[in-house]
Amino acid sequence: MEEDDEFGDLYSDVLQPFQPPVVLPPPPPLPHRSIDLNLRSQDQDVSEPNSAPISRVSDNDAVKLSTQDATRQAIVDGGGDDKDMSFDIEEPDADSTPTIPGLFVTGALPGLATDRGVSQVTTRIEQQVGGGGDGGYGGQGEGDDWDSDSEDDLQIVLNDSSRNVMIGGADRRSRMGDNEDDDDEDDEDPLVIVADTDPNQPMEEQMWGEDGLQGIEGDGKDGGEAGKGSGPGGATGPPKAGYSSHGYHPFHSQFKYVRPGAAPIPGGAASVGGPSSGQVRPPANLGPMAGRGRGDWRPLGMRNASAAQKGFHQPWGSNTAGRGLDFTLPSHKTIFEVDIDSFEEKPWRYPGVEMTDYFNFGLNEESWKDYCKQLDQHRIQTTMQSRIRVYESGRTDQGYDPDLPPELAAATGAQGVPVDSSNLVKPDSVQGDSAKVPANVRPTLPPGRPIPVETGSGERLPSIDTRAPRMRDLDAIIEIVCQDSHEDEPSGENGTDQADSSLPGENVPVETSYVNNKRPDTESAEHSPAQDEPHKNLLKKQDDEISRSTDSGQSFRSSSPVGDRGTRSSSVDREDVGGEAGKDAEMGEELKMSFTSPQSAVQEDDGGESKTERSSESSKARSGSHRDFQQEEDVIQDKHSSRPANNRKQYDNNAPHQSRKNQDRGKEMERTRAASKGGRENSNPHMELDSTYIYSIASREDFDKRKERDVDGAVWRRKEDDPYSRRGGDEGSRKRDREDDPGFRQRGKMRENEIRSKDDQVPSRKHMDDAGMRNIYEPDDHINKRRKDEEYLRRSRPEKNEISYGQRESMSRVKRERDDRLEHQKRDVQHKIRDDFDDHGSLRQRDDIYMQRDGNERLRERDVLDKLKLPHEDGISARGRERQVAVRGHRGSEDRSSRMKDEYKASDKEHVTKDTLRHAKQTKRRDYPGEESSSHHRGHEDFSARTDNIVNNEKKPRQERTGAKIDKFIDTLDGQRLQDRKHKDSRRKIKEQREGTESLSKQGEQNGSSVVTGSKGTNDARNCRSEIPHQPNTAKRHKENASSGDEIHDSKRGRTKLERWASHKEREDAVSAKSSSISSKLEEKENNTNGRLSEPVHGSIGKSRDVTEEKIGHDLADTKDGSEKGPGDRHLDTVEKLKKRSERFKLPMPTEKDTTGVKKMESETLPSAKIEGPVDSEGEYVWDERSCVRIGREYA
């Protein structure tokens, strides 16, 4: 036969429309052989080529077939045509047999195997109409239906292990044939040919009777018999294998089921055997089968369900699902759910039928039922267990749950039941719900655990997991922390380097900017607005404090390298190096700087070189944390408290590098000075960034950084503990305030130029200054400083007076004045000790000596202050207000309160400067060097001491503060008095005013405004409060009133004090009615009595001071008595003061009457206003710390 006609062609017929096969005469019916024989005979000799019966199936035959004819194994599936389909079963060599998937090449098609044991079967499908019958499955005859369905849709699937389908193929077929009725041709055809689209469809379309249980050409009986017992009958039976074969591999048939639209499984025709079980049609009446089977059993046009049912065979031997094509098993069901008992026909019960053809695993009908029951039970158990697990998943109690439903409770005991029966079924067998399939049973989980859920891509993950990490924020935070630690932590001499390297990009530029005096620039540039905000706030606060409590003029010369940081040591180094002259200037400034608060230091650091600001720049710019700024402040203070030795070490270690660094910084400072001025001014409106100031900033910065390097946390703690360092910082802020002053700025500019030149020449000096080597810088610088300071003092007296007012406000000023005295003394010592910060101790000792000298006086002053404190405050409230009103009238809107301190100190300093310039530069130098040295010392120690003095002076009477200042003040006052005596006639009023102012300012400054807090403290505090804003005007007016430059200076001072002492001047007039000579003597005596003249400025002046001091005690008592005069005089004074205020220093000197009234008022106020101390005979008050009496000064 041609290859086309062989199984290959047959297989192609499955996929392609059948070629009209050559019609072969039907061979004689094959001897009846059992399916087993057929199955076995497949391996037998092929010696009988004709052994394979050729089944011609025609519609006529199918119609004629009766139940007896059913034995005829001619099966035509959908072969409605009369065309003969002859299945030629040839026995060519086994090797030549075409291989059909699922079909043994050597074996005869199931059911086609004959008794001859045809090993090779060539099936020729003869279809005249192209209707295909499976030759291997049996002649599928003619079927017109075949044509319509089989050409495209017919797929013959042969299962090589068709033995299950074939089981008892011929016999079953014969049975089927016997049972099938001829009533309907469609119904009688047991052969089911699987169609591509719907395996059930072809059969639905096909009339079973038509496709007919056709016997092999021969009697239906023969066919039936052959179907039962003969292989040929079995061979004719195979067409039914098409039915059963669809989707039923003998190995998989029980596990896989024909689903609607499912493609037939190759070789799945296990029922290829002629009457093989696969040929069994689903019974017509098998609707949904009874039992668990929920499958849709379709009659498929079966008219004789009984016949079909009789012939029905389940190849897998279990439930009716065996019908395969007829039975549509829902995808959610399994064969195990089909109840085989519902089948009317049970072919496996036929004698000679191989049970293995129907049941696998050695099961039989009963065992299968048992197995199904076990599966049911197991499914129930697993289902209940799973439910129980779900139910108990949230329960921690593993014990019996009374709320557990009985079913679940019963199933709970079955949890431990082994799933042994599941082993009976291949895992493949599980097609149904996992809950029902034991193989799908999940291992039980201990109760109480959450239900295991397999993660899927679609599941929602926690946002924390899905959220992209924000590394920037983390980095920024970490960076801030690191920066804080780096900046705040000292690392010996490397601290600066580390600080620089901590944020190499930021820190270094900041350092450089600092050193270059660009630091303000860099700082302002680097400072974020938030950074500038704190600085500006600090600066504003500092400015307020400075205006209140610090002398604007005193703004510590930290504008020079000394005072930038306000560090005691750095300022001492620079001021010491600067020399006495520099000290003189700086001393006045430092006195002005009388440290208000550590915040001032912070601001000084901000305005000057505030490392705080620097750290805030670095740390804030880098980390943006204000905490760093605060830490920097502390560190700065600590660093300031570090001794010059450390600084020198730092300089020595870092000198070369620092020199280079300073050079670079100097250049960079110059480049960025303008920007730094802008930024610094932005950050610190008071600060115009004198180059000197910038230099000092840079120097201090370097110095601080070196300190950071060299200074350990302990040193910093010492610095923190050291009030002077904080004072120095505040003084630095004062210095910034001074920088706001034009004179100070000019001086700062001069210094800046000098500093620039020095920076260019000795860039390391900045570091040296910072490292305690400021002495190198200081000598020349202080000379210029002194000059600038002198000019500045002249200009800044009003500011000093303003600041002195703030000093007056605090009784703690007494302490500050003491400190100021000590500071002046220390300054005197400091210009000697400039090179060594450690000499501060000696300065302190000397200050202690001075304090011992002044101790008694201060004790007296304290006693007096305590006694007069309330009266003094009252007097201040009354007369001071009047004076303030007058002074306000004179001075306008100037800051009176802040300038009071400055006025006292500034006026003292100004008078000291002027008198010194005019009369005794030596005395002035004594005063200034003392002041400078003490200001340097204060810058390191006394700055904070002065600041404390200011605060304490504000808290305490001024009398105590006058102690130390009175000495120098008296010295300068003596020289001034000499000049005043010379100019008595011409400048009598001016001198009186000026001297009063000098005495007040100097005493207030030296005494920390504590002595001034005496009699003057009350009146002057009031007047000065009002006068503080007027001081500049007063100075100007003094200039106008001054007949000469000296007189102008005196008049400036005097005017500033005149403004303060408008009422005092009136009193002075009254006192002048007395002998001016007597008043002058009294002044000298009172000055001597004030005890501040521990050192007579001049021999004659010293003597006069001694006499005056001796008289002061008496005068004090007299003044006290006089001060008890009725307040009416005070009011008179106030009225006159107001008038004079309107005159703005054009006030005529008060008449003797007025002065007398004023004296009375003041004398009356004195007991009440302890501050009102010695008053000139003219009414000018000389604040005596101890006696707080008014010394009337009268110039003949």
Curated annotation (Swiss-Prot):
Motif, Nuclear localization signal 2: chain positions: 734-741
Compositional bias of kind Acidic residues: 142-154, 179-190
Motif annotated as Nuclear localization signal 1, chain positions: 704-711
Stretches with biased composition (Polar residues): 117-126, 549-561, 643-657, 998-1021
Region entry Disordered, spans: 1-102, 117-248, 268-300, 413-472, 485-1174
Principal cellular location given in the protein's record: nucleus
GO cellular component terms attached to this protein's record: nucleus
Effect of gene knockout: Lethal.
One Pfam family it belongs to: Fip1
Domain of life: Eukaryota
Ranges of biased composition (kind: Low complexity): 268-278
Comp. bias (Gly residues): 129-141, 226-236
Entry's Gene Ontology BP terms: mRNA processing
Segments crossing the lipid bilayer: none
Pro residues bias (residue ranges): 18-31
Keywords assigned by UniProt, alphabetized: mRNA processing, Nucleus, Repeat, RNA-binding
One MF term in the entry's GO annotations: RNA binding
Basic and acidic residues composition-biased segments: 518-548, 565-592, 608-641, 661-673, 699-802, 810-918, 925-945, 953-971, 1046-1071, 1103-1137, 1151-1163
Tissue: Expressed in leaves, stems, flower tissues and roots.
PANTHER family in UniProt: FIP1[III]-LIKE PROTEIN, FIP1[V]-LIKE PROTEIN
Subunit structure: Component of the cleavage and polyadenylation specificity factor (CPSF) complex. Forms a complex with cleavage and polyadenylation specificity factor (CPSF) subunits CFIS1, CFIS2, CPSF30, CSTF50, CSTF64, CSTF77, FIPS3, PABN1, PABN2, PABN3, PAPS4, CFIM25 and PABN1. Binds RNA.
Similarity comment: Belongs to the FIP1 family.
Main function: Essential gene. Component of the cleavage and polyadenylation specificity factor (CPSF) complex that plays a key role in pre-mRNA 3'-end formation, recognizing the AAUAAA signal sequence and interacting with poly(A) polymerase and other factors to bring about cleavage and poly(A) addition. FIP1L1 contributes to poly(A) site recognition and stimulates poly(A) addition. Binds to U-rich RNA sequence elements surrounding the poly(A) site. May act to tether poly(A) polymerase to the CPSF complex.
Protein name per Swiss-Prot or TrEMBL: FIP1[V]-like protein
Source organism of the structure: Arabidopsis thaliana
